[in-house]
Each structure stands twice: as structure tokens, then as C-alpha cells.
Design a protein with these regions (language model features):
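Conserved nucleotide-sugar donor-binding catalytic segment
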Residues: 87, 141-220
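C-terminal subregions of glycosyltransferases and related glycan-biosynthesis enzymes
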Residues: 175-176, 181, 188, 192, ...
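Glycine-rich, basic loop-to-helix element that forms the pyrophosphate-binding segment
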Residues: 72-89, 110
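Conserved donor NDP-sugar-binding/catalytic core segment of glycosyltransferases
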Residues: 106-135
Length: 326
């Protein structure tokens, strides 16, 4: 609520579509079933070739004034499409929606209640139809700045953000996942909060953008590694450091993280760019010292510190977060 406790804060929903006819109606119906009033539903279509656009027009006609539909003149890809669509939002907050998920009725109301003064709020989510699979398999329990420098654990489809925060980000690189970029800026700004409850069902299937990107991303990695990250993590790290988007990402963070406010994340960002063995050793020692902020698992004590020490190698092994680079 606003300061006068009478008018709900306005929330825009932003969805990007591409050939989403199979599940689009289910997601639209779940958005319309929210128990929180929506300011607008913005949908930006990336040149779909199926019936997606016709479905969108049907919903827009059934709900005059609520839907704002846009169709790109050329295909932008999901990263650029989401960024440009987010800039169209006019509500005080903006919620990001995939085209094929299902939102639970209290998703928006619970996130508006939780966000407080933070720039970003995200939540747990389910990925199975019966809502039974453990949530920790899909959202890391760690939301510390230090951990999120290694891992994108804030999925865009679960985000609610302050619109002025999104529009205040001046530099974007479309070879960096848009949701990771948003979460990093939130960490450098007024922070982020997490609702420890599943507020949507995220659908994984062969045609989804997420599934396509992740399949494209994995390289030289076994599905359930044991010793491999320790043996091959260094080589994978060197491979990542040669990628332009990797260097852009950590150079930007090294230059923009406030060293007085976030001394450890600032140091980690700088060390992620260095090649020499002493820099790797220093990074490993930092991760061992602050393992409770960095390592996503539950090990404590000596075991936790050992896992933390090797986390720079563990996180580099099979890392797919920089595979958008062409």
C-alpha cells in the first residue's frame, strides 16, 4: 500500500512470447486470477509463427484497457526482448512472466507485501505438475552477494522489481542473462529479498527457452559429477576467462561494487578476472573463510570450509552462465 494506506501500489506484468500457443492460455488465465489488482499486462512478441499473436489479441479484446500488445519488427532473442519490454512498464512495480508457467493466485500480493525497500523480490517455485519436488533443487538457499557472484539463482520468471530501479540501469549486455544482471544491480543498490514459498509453477519442456539455453550451455560436464569439478575446474575457469562476456561481467562489477559497503564481493569480482595461481589461491582462501555466504550446500565446520575452498573450481566446472556469447 501507499503511504495513505488506501491505494494499492501499481503493478505491471511483463511477458515475452515466442511460439507459445501450447501453454499461453494457462499462464494468461493464472495472471488474470491474481488476488491483487493489476495495472497493465504488457506482452511483447518476438515474431511468433504460430497462433500466439491471435491468442494475445483475443485476451486483449476480452479485457479492454488491461493488455498492451507489441510485436517486434525483427527477432530480438529472449534476453533483449525482456529488457526492451521491461522499459515499457508504467506501474510502480513490474512482475516478469514467462509464457508457459502458471502463477498461484497470491503471487503478486505476497511479493508486494515482502519487497519492502528492496529493489527486487523473488521466490521459490515448483517444476513438477503435482507441486511435490523439493524447492531447494531449483532455487539456491544462498542469496548472499558473495554467492551470487558465482551463480545466477534469481530466476526472472519469479521476480517483482521496482520499475524505477529497472529503468535506472543504463548499461546492458545481451550476452549476459538479464535476470542475473538485474540481481547484481539490486545487490549493489537497495538489495533483494526472497519469499521462501513457491509462488509459481515453472514449466520445463523441450520447446521452452530455458531448456534450450541450458542444453546449449553444458559442455565437457557429466550429469552428476563427483571428482570431476576438482580435477577439471581450473581448465574450465581458464576457458571462461577467455570469453568476452565473462570479462565484461566481472570487470563491470569490479568497477562498480562499493568497496566500503561490500568489501568481500568487490575483492571476489577482481580476483575472478586474474589468471595467476596466487590469485586463484587467494580466491579459494576467501571462499573458505566466508563459505557460509558462498557455498550453497549444508556442510559446516571443516567440511564446509573445504567445500568453500574449492568452490571457485566447482562453480567453473560445466558453467553455462556465459554461453550466450555468439
Amino acid at each position: 500500500m501507499n503511504d495513505d494506506n488506501s491505494t494499492p501500489l501499481t503493478v505491471s506484468v511483463v511477458m515475452c512470447t515466442y511460439n507459445g500457443e501450447q501453454f499461453l492460455r494457462e499462464q494468461m488465465d493464472s495472471i488474470l486470477a491474481q488476488d491483487y489488482p493489476l495495472h497493465e499486462i504488457i506482452v511483447q512478441d518476438d515474431r511468433s509463427t504460430d497462433d500466439t499473436w491471435d491468442i494475445l489479441q483475443t485476451y486483449a479484446k476480452a479485457h479492454p484497457g488491461l493488455f498492451k500488445l507489441f510485436r517486434n519488427d525483427e527477432q530480438l532473442g529472449f534476453n533483449r526482448n525482456f529488457h526492451t519490454a521491461l522499459l515499457r512498464a508504467t506501474g510502480e512495480y513490474v512482475a516478469i512472466s514467462d509464457q508457459d508457467d502458471i502463477w498461484f493466485p497470491q503471487k503478486i500480493s505476497k511479493q508486494v507485501a515482502a519487497i519492502g525497500n528492496a529493489d527486487l523480490c523473488f521466490s521459490d517455485y515448483y517444476t513438477d505438475l503435482h507441486y511435490t519436488l523439493p524447492l531447494h533443487n531449483y532455487v539456491s538457499p544462498r542469496t548472499d552477494f558473495e554467492h551470487m557472484l558465482f551463480y545466477d539463482c534469481t530466476p526472472g520468471h519469479s521476480m517483482l522489481l521496482r520499475t524505477d530501479f529497472v529503468k535506472g540501469i543504463k548499461l546492458w549486455n545481451y550476452d549476459i542473462y538479464y535476470d542475473w544482471w538485474l540481481s547484481m544491480h539490486a545487490q549493489m543498490g537497495h538489495g533483494l529479498v526472497k519469499v521462501d514459498e513457491a509462488l509459481n509453477w515453472h514449466r520445463h519442456y523441450d520447446g521452452s527457452a530455458t531448456t534450450h539455453v541450458y542444453r546449449k550451455g553444458f559442455y565437457e560436464a557429466v550429469p552428476h559429477p563427483t571428482w570431476q569439478p576438482y580435477a577439471w575446474g581450473t581448465l574450465h575457469r581458464l576457458h571462461l576467462q577467455r570469453k568476452r562476456n565473462y570479462r565484461f561481467f566481472y570487470t563491470y562489477l569490479a568497477q562498480h561494487i562499493d568497496r566500503r559497503k561490500h568489501p568481500v564481493p568487490a575483492r571476489i569480482a577482481r580476483l575472478m578476472l586474474r589468471h595467476c595461481p596466487f590469485a586463484v589461491l587467494e580466491l579459494c582462501l576467501i571462499c573458505a573463510k566466508y563459505y557460509n555466504r558462498i557455498y550453497p550446500g549444508k556442510p559446516r565446520g571443516l567440511k564446509g570450509r573445504i567445500r568453500g575452498f574449492f568452490y571457485p573450481l566447482i562453480s567453473a566446472y560445466g558453467n553455462d552462465l556465459f554461453k550466450l556469447e555468439k
